Amino acid sequence: MKRRSPIFRMMVLLLGIALLFGGCAPEFSQNTQGNSSTLEAMAPTVTPSASHFPVQSETPAEPVTVEGEITAVRRSSFTLLLEDGTQLTVIPSREHMEDDELLQGNRAQVIYCPQERQENQIKALQVTVTVPEAYAQVEKLLDTMTLEEKVGQLFFVRYPGKKAPEEEARYQFGGYILFGKDFQELTKGEVAAQVEACQKEAKIPMLMGVDEEGGTVVRVSLNPNLRETPFPSPRELFKQGGLTMVTETEAEKCQLLKELGINVNFAPVCDVSQKEDAFMYSRSLGQNAQVTGDFVRETVGVYREENVGCVLKHFPGYGENGDTHTGVVVDRRSYADFLEEDFLPFREGIRAGAGCVLVSHNVVTCVDDEKPASLSGEWHRVLREELGFTGCVITDDLVMGAIQDYCDASSAAVQAVLAGNDLLCCSDYSTQYPAVWEAVQKGEISEDRVEQSVRRVLRWKVALGLL
C-alpha cells in the first residue's frame, strides 16, 4: 500500500477542522439592553488552509428562534415551555445561567442552530429574558408592604371558621386552607360568599386552598350540595379510562373550585407507590415513576389552562413508607433511588410549570439523617438546584405528628423559614405566627430572607391572576 506524505495528511486534517466548524457553533459575548438581558453569539472564525486543494464545507443552517415560558432552572440549563406544550432543555453560556431574571414565569427568546439540536435539547446562540409587566409590579408592591404584612404572607393557615375575615384583617395571611367541615351543608353560593368575605379584608388577594385529590381525600365534593358524588381517585380513573379520564375529571374539578372562589388545589400526588399496603398507595396513581410522571405533567397542564393553582406533593417522595401524620417516618433509601424513581414525577410537574411544591416531614437519610425534609436546608437545596424549582415551596402541616415528635410548634415554624420554605402550612397560627415574628424582630430570620419568600408568593399570585 502506498504511504501518504505528511503534507497530504496535514491537508486532510485541516479539511476536517474546516468542516467541523462550518456550522453555527458560537463564541459568546454579553449584551444587556433595558429590562431584557441578552446573550449573543459571535460568528465562528475559520482560518483558510494553505493547501492547493479548495476546502469544501456545508452551507450553515439558518438559526432558529423559539419563545416560551421559563419553568425549571438548573445549574447549567433551563426548561423552556412553548405555547404548544413542547418542553425544551436550553443550554446557554455559563454567564447567562447567573442571570437573576432566569426565573419561573419569565419569558425567554432563544436562538439556536438546528444542526446541534438533540431531540428536545438545544444549545443557545442567544438568549433574551423578558420579565412580564405583571411580575415587574411585584417589586413595587414589596416596597409598599410593612414588615408585619410581609410575615403574614408566609402563612397558609387552617381556615378559622366564622372569625376568618376578622383574622385576615388582623394578620394579612397569604392564604387559607379549608377542610371538609368548612363546607358541610353549605350551598355553592354560601361557600363563595364566605370566601369573598375573607378576600375583602385582604390587602393582597388570598390563596384559598383545599385538598381535593379525589378518592380518600376530598373536602369539597363530600358535600352533595356541591357535587352529587365525591370525585374518584386518579388511580381509579386511570384504571377506567387512562389519562384522558383523569384529565377530564381534573378539569371538572377546577371548574367547581373556581365557582366557590377556591384558587389552589393541594394536588396532584406525585408519590410513586405500587404496593397496596403502603400508606400512600390509595392516594397515588399506583403506577411506576414514568407513568406517574406523565400523569403529573398532564394534570399540571390542565390546572394551568384552568388558571387554578396546583401543588406537587409530597417531595422528595413517600415511596412505600408510613404515615407522618402520626409520627416520625425514616426513609433509608439511596439517593440513586430518588434520582431514578421519586424525582421523576416532580421533575415533570416542575417542567410543566407547577407553581408550588409541598415538602413532606419524612426524615430521608441519604441527604439529611437528622431533620425532616420540610425543615432540612439540604433537601431544599436539592429541590432548587437538582430539580431546578424557582417557585413557591410550602411545608406539610406543621402540627402533624412527625413534627411534634421532632420539635414544638413554634420552633418548627422558625426552622421551616430558615430551611427555605416560602409558605408555612399550619393549623396553629396563634403559636407559630408570633414565633416567626419574634425571630424576625431578633434578626434570627433576616428581612431579606422574608422578602425572598414573599417575592415568590406574590409571583405565584400573579401567575394565578390574583394580582
Predicted regions and their residues:
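Preference for extracellular/luminal or secreted protein segments
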Residues: K2, A25-N31, E40, E133-E167, ...
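A short macromolecule-binding patch
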Residues: T86-R94
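Short, well-ordered coil/turn segments that N-cap beta-strands
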Residues: G152-Q153, G174, K203-M208, I262-N263, ...
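Enzymes and membrane/adaptor proteins characterized by extended Gly/Ser/Thr/Asp/Glu-rich
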Residues: A169-T292, H314, G319-R332, S360-L375, ...
